[in-house]
UniProtKB/Swiss-Prot annotation:
It is an enzyme of class 1 (oxidoreductase). It comes from Streptococcus pneumoniae serotype 19F (strain G54). Signal peptide: none annotated. The lineage of its organism: Bacteria, Bacillati, Bacillota, Bacilli, Lactobacillales. GO terms for cellular component: cytosol. The gene is ilvC. Mg(2+) 2 binds at D191, E227, E231. It holds the Pfam family KARI_C. Belongs to the ketol-acid reductoisomerase family. This is Ketol-acid reductoisomerase (NADP(+)).
């Protein structure tokens, strides 16, 4: 399947004109979507449960309501609460207030694709999924460009769902740099696979394994940390900027030769088969059900995984080394918090 990048000129209909927009949730993505849309001239209110997010939204100048109140007032409702709480939030506070002709949006297809949330047939369902964290969605918008986004339609009750999704993407700044049309199935499954097999799960497991190999062979933990973790950003930045080609042009011949010779010894066909098994568990819903069931049980598995990860030797070594590198970790930690 070949997809074509679309831009502001391709957003033909100002579908959000005259619409009351409710952003549900005011965390990482919520604050960015809401502020960008407001700055794009849209009529935005916030729906959120009492707490830090509620207070922050009011502080930022938004009319802020309970989730149920905001849903009743709005024509277009974007649900940007964490995936695991969306089902109960939708069933208790959003669904009873929906009306025919409303539009409901998401930034990730998880709950719609796996059918944890079922929206009435007379309501549009769309997606705007920026390919970056909320603080970058906001910052790049303020700088005059944006973060690329995927958009999709799951249900088109009014015949206007695609226009709403594209206009939403334009409003948050994504159409300045590029939009790609997708489906809920494709976005959800690819996004989860990327996170689990490569970007988060695969990467951290690779780094930890490399650290263990070096330290178990007698090398100093501090030096091992620099070799397998600290330098990762330098390499990833080069790949991000110009693909594998730019990275390989920027490293030594020794490193490049070692890349070709040893990379396939680490990432073998068996690793690829393991990746296929990860993808299968995503496609058949096993991962989604395990994740949701763990949340409903009080997160025992997630809590145990977090405790185990916090006690890794590489984390302890890294924490000490970063104290001596004041230029590392200067980002505002608050920008990365997600308030429920």
């Amino acid at each position: 399947m070949t997809v074509q990048m679309e831009y502001e000129k391709d957003v033909k209909v100002a579908a959000l004109d005259g619409k009351k927009i409710a952003v549900i949730g005011y965390g990482s993505q919520g604050h960015a979507h809401a502020q960008n849309l407001r700055d794009s001239g849209r009529d935005v209110i916030i729906g959120v449960r009492p707490g830090k997010s509620f207070d922050k939204a009011k502080e930022d100048g938004f009319d802020t309501y309970t989730v149920a109140e905001a849903t009743k007032l709005a024509d277009v409702i974007m649900i940007l609460a964490p995936d695991e709480i969306q089902q109960e939030l939708y069933e208790a506070e959003i669904a009873p207030s929906l009306e025919a002709g409303n539009a409901v949006g998401f930034a990730h297809g998880f709950n719609i694709h796996f059918e944890f949330i079922k929206v009435p047939a007379d309501v549009d369902v769309f997606m705007c999924a920026p390919k970056g964290p909320g603080h970058l969605v906001r910052r790049t918008y303020e700088e005059g460009f944006g973060v690329p986004a995927l958009y999709a339609v799951y249900x088109d009750a009014t015949g206007n769902a695609k226009n709403i999704x594209m206009d939403w993407c334009k409003g948050v700044g994504a159409a300045r740099v590029g939009l790609l049309e997708t489906t809920y199935k494709e976005e959800t499954e690819e996004d989860l696979f990327g996170e689990q097999a490569v970007l988060c799960g695969g990467l951290t497991a690779l780094i930890e394994a490399g650290f263990e190999v070096l330290t178990e062979a007698g090398y100093a933990p501090e030096l091992a940390y620099f070799e397998v973790l600290h330098e990762m950003k330098l390499i990833v930045d080069l790949i991000y900027e110009g693909g594998f080609k730019k990275m390989r042009q920027s490293i030594s011949n020794t490193a490049e030769y070692g890349d070709y010779v040893s990379g396939p010894r680490v990432i073998t066909e068996q690793v690829k088969e393991n990746m296929k098994a990860v993808l299968a568990d995503i496609q058949n819903g096993k991962f989604a059900n395990d994740f949701v069931n763990d949340y409903k049980a009080g997160r025992p598995k997630l809590t145990a995984y977090r405790e185990q990860a916090a006690n890794l030797e590489i984390e302890k070594v890294g924490a000490e080394l970063r104290k001596a590198m004041p230029f590392v970790g200067k980002n505002d930690d608050d920008a990365f918090k997600i308030y429920n």
